[in-house]
Amino acid sequence: MAKEILVAYGVDIDAVAGWLGSYGGEDSPDDISRGLFAGEVGIPRLLKLFKKYHLPATWFSPGHSIETFSEQMKMIVDAGHEVGAHGYSHENPIAMTAKQEEDVLLKSVELIKDLTGKAPTGYVAPWWEFSNITNELLLKHGFKYDHSLMHNDFTPYYVRVGDSWSKIDYSLEAKDWMKPLIRGVETDLVEIPANWYLDDLPPMMFIKKSPNSFGFVSPHDIGQMWIDQFDWVYREMDYAVFSMTIHPDVSARPQVLLMHEKIIEHINKHEGVRWVTFNEIADDFLKRNPRKK
């Protein structure tokens, strides 16, 4: 059977928004300056990388980045890339009220429409955190796919909502928490799985307020880890989606750009590989797996 391996870069433009909403840098001029680097220097460097190898990409942008880096965002659109939603200030959906989460989503949609001329079809939850209404809001506002959950790794699926589980409460009897997870119901939202082991940020970006922040892991090690994952997928699967999550904050650094060149050139040696946008992945999945209602 011929191989069909869909490969994609998802670029999260966290920039200043990441420091405001997730990384604890909202009071640090130095950390904010790192966010400015991501938008003003990092975006053009990644665009140059994608142009060199003729690759499409999907850029998931906080609304804050769209408004703060309007010139660079226009460059992304002019290059023909897809733009998806990623919060406004990289807010944690779990921490927001239902109204706050919807207001942020609506603002994101509005900004992307103004930028690209069309509504976004895809969403990435900041910090990959899904609230108990995120799925409902995405479907309500016309989204086709999400890229935040991890029920699988290299195969898309339909998002399920309503899973429930019992947390341990040592003030109760053990029988009160010894219960299995109960699965909810499938929805129309396509999930393109997220994967912490194909994300550049945790190992290669130093965050002062994060206890598990590294920032100085060698790109040679990370690059080999990503190549090893691709090699296993190519050997074991005839159809698969291999999506990598990167950030201009991290992947626009020289040592990481060189890592990506090696990964791209390695992947391109294989037959049956196609570089695509995330929207193309979702459309391909829907054709292969029409949902039975």
Swiss-Prot record:
Keywords: Carbohydrate metabolism, Cell wall biogenesis/degradation, Hydrolase, Metal-binding, Polysaccharide degradation, Stress response, Xylan degradation, Zinc. It is an enzyme of class 3 (hydrolase). It comes from Helicobacter pylori (strain ATCC 700392 / 26695) (Campylobacter pylori). GO terms for biological process: cell wall organization; xylan catabolic process. Residues 29-276 form the NodB homology domain. Zn(2+) binds at residues 14, 86, 90. It holds the Pfam family Polysacc_deac_1. It catalyses: Deacetylation of xylans and xylo-oligosaccharides. InterPro entries: Glyco_hydro/deAcase_b/a-brl (IPR011330), NODB_dom (IPR002509), PgdA-like (IPR037950). This is Peptidoglycan deacetylase. Catalyzes the N-deacetylation of peptidoglycan (PG), an important mechanism that appears to confer lysozyme resistance and to mitigate host immune detection; this likely contributes to pathogen persistence in the host. The exact nature of the residue in PG that is deacetylated has not been determined. Is also able to catalyze the deacetylation of acetylated xylan, and, to a lesser extent, that of chitin and chitosan. Therefore, this enzyme might play a role during infection, considering that xylan-containing carbohydrate structures are among those commonly consumed by humans. Its EC number is 3.5.1.-, 3.1.1.72. It comes from the Bacteria. Optimum pH is 6.0 with acetylated xylan as substrate. Is active at acidic pH ranging from 5.0 to 6.0. GO terms for molecular function: acetylxylan esterase activity; hydrolase activity, acting on carbon-nitrogen (but not peptide) bonds; metal ion binding. Induction: Its expression is markedly up-regulated upon cell exposure to oxidative stress. Is also significantly induced (3.5-fold) when H.pylori cells are in contact with macrophages. Belongs to the polysaccharide deacetylase family. Homotetramer. Optimum temperature is 50 degrees Celsius with acetylated xylan as substrate. Retains about 80% of the activity at 30-55 degrees Celsius. Disruption phenotype: Cells lacking this gene are considerably less resistant to lysozyme than wild-type, and show an absence or significantly reduced amount of N-deacetylated muropeptides in the bacterial PG. Mutant strains also have attenuated ability to colonize mouse stomachs, and induce a stronger immune response in the host. Disruption of this gene does not affect oxidative stress resistance characteristics, indicating that the major physiological role of the enzyme is not in combating oxidative stress. Disulfide bonds: none annotated.
